[in-house]
Amino acid sequence: MSTNQQESDGATRVAYILGMPLAENVVRQWPQMGEIVRTSRLVADVEGNFPELTLEVGRRLQLDDVVVVEWTCDYGDGRLYRNVTIGELEDGQAVRVTDYWGEPTVTPEWRQPLTDRLDMPGDGIWPNREHLSHY
């Protein structure tokens, strides 16, 4: 996290990720941390603490009032986080957003003979570092 928080202009990365605007009263939650943030302004304020973050969307699926997005980010430390964001929609705006991600890990030795490597081309669903941008 940056100690030099940037002032938010109200735009959010999560709106880019979802491909649609956030409702003013949006609720964004991170279950793995047990956190929730309310309002688009506070979402933007939280995001402003990570100016080094780069990201790109790999796949976005929309079904009626739900959008599910697979995306990749780098917080500036060189590690690629693979994420899933679910947006619940009303009137073309996201009213509830749930983000899931975990730190990158290595396959445990015991599991290696049981699994194959996931094909992850750099310009595919899980972009590599060269395909990430600032938003």
Where are these regions (language model features)?
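C-terminal and inter-domain tail/linker signature
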Residues: 1-135
